[in-house]
């Protein structure tokens, strides 16, 4: 009997803890408990597109999942609410006065009016639409490699109902008027409906633009219904076109040398030591300058990549000027499949010594290289 009572107490305590814990927001979003803000945003955005009620109007289960998803994002995207949730669960967040209810729909900050009112997503063909707005969004190569979210604050012009009425839906109609016996005249008149009056106001809007992992130059992110308003129809779309900036130099680290962050204004003389990536499709290209000594004897070095990891480059044979080394899966991630990456292609330049050699050193080089049989020859190198 005592064993049974103890078991019931344990079970009751477990159920109480389970109820107090509430929903597992990390599980709902499909992220780990140490996920960063960008990972949380990306997870929400991916699921919200599929579960939004306007896309699943008759699916009650999808609607419930979307409510849970919105509640999870509302809490985990807020630092204070997330900290409270991590300590005391959903009940703790509710006690602090907000969040977790699922009533807030952050969907529009990622997509605009994605489904409602036509919004550029298949509205009535006869419905007039405001002009689309296209904005160039300049991002770094690091942001395109790793993925990024850019918060855009803007003022949006919208029409709001006000007092009075106005003429609307105006069109031309043909009328017939009898001029006399057997005589008629046809003429065109302008006919309008009476609609509630509206005025143009400015609203503050915050949009989250996702720079997807592996984003391509020219890729466009569309926010439906966030463009120019139309007094008798739907607003146009707001489009952000990705423009990838030329990559600045980054540092290399020969084994045993600590990587330092250079300040350009203080260390201008070291500019030639910097390396930058150039992107072509999903491949990355860079040039590395090595000494003649390393070109002949071999070398080992590391290149700092766009996400902070080091790429080891090693040669144990002669490296000639213009030689290329290809590193598989060290290029850009594919936008369609982030698990696939292009090549990193390293081209080597060789820096020759600037000091003059003594006669003895020249004789030693001749003896070592044994290239007496190779004569200078001219060719068209253009």
Swiss-Prot record:
This is DnaJ homolog dnj-20. The keyword Signal applies. It holds the Pfam family DnaJ_C. GO terms for cellular component: endoplasmic reticulum. CDD domains: DnaJ, DnaJ_C. Residues 24-89 form the J domain. The gene is dnj-20. SMART domains: DnaJ. Residues 1-21 form the signal peptide. Keywords: Chaperone, Signal.
């Amino acid at each position: 009997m005592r064993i049974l009572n103890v078991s019931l107490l344990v079970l009751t305590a477990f159920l109480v803890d389970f109820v107090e814990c509430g929903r597992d927001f990390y599980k709902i979003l499909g992220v780990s408990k140490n996920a960063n803000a960008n990972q949380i945003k990306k997870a929400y955005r991916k699921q919200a597109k599929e579960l939004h009620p306007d896309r699943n109007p008759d699916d009650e289960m999808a609607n419930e999942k979307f409510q849970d998803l919105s509640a999870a994002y509302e809490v985990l995207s807020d630092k204070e609410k997330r900290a409270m949730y991590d300590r005391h669960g959903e009940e703790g967040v509710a006690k602090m006065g907000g969040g977790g209810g699922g009533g807030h729909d952050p969907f529009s900050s990622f997509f605009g009016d994605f489904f409602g009112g036509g919004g550029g997503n298949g509205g009535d063909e006869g419905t007039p639409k405001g002009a689309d707005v296209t904005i160039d969004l300049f991002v770094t190569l690091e942001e395109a490699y790793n993925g990024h979210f850019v918060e855009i604050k803007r003022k949006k012009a919208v029409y709001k109902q006000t007092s009075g009425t106005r003429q609307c839906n105006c069109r031309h109609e043909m009328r017939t008027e009898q001029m006399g016996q057997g005589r008629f005249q046809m003429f065109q008149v302008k006919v309008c409906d009476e609609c509630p009056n509206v005025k143009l106001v400015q609203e503050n809007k915050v949009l989250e633009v996702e720079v997807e992992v592996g984003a391509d130059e020219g890729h466009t992110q569309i926010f439906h219904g966030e463009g120019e308003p139309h007094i008798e129809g739907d607003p146009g779309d707001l489009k952000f076109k990705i423009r990838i900036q030329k990559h600045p130099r980054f540092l290399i680290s020969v084994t045993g040398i600590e990587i330092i962050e250079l300040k350009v204004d203080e260390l201008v003389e070291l500019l030639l030591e910097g390396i930058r990536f150039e992107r072509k499709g999903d491949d990355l290209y860079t040039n590395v300058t090595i000494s003649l000594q390393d070109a002949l004897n071999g070398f080992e070095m590391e290149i700092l990549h766009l996400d902070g990891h080091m790429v080891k480059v090693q040669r144990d044979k002669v490296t000639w000027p213009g030689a290329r080394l290809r590193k598989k899966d060290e290029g850009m991630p594919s936008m369609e499949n982030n698990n696939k990456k292009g090549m990193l292609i390293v081209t080597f330049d060789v820096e020759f010594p600037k000091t003059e050699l003594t006669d003895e050193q020249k004789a030693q080089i001749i003896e070592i290289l044994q290239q007496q049989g190779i004569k200078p020859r001219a060719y068209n190198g253009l």
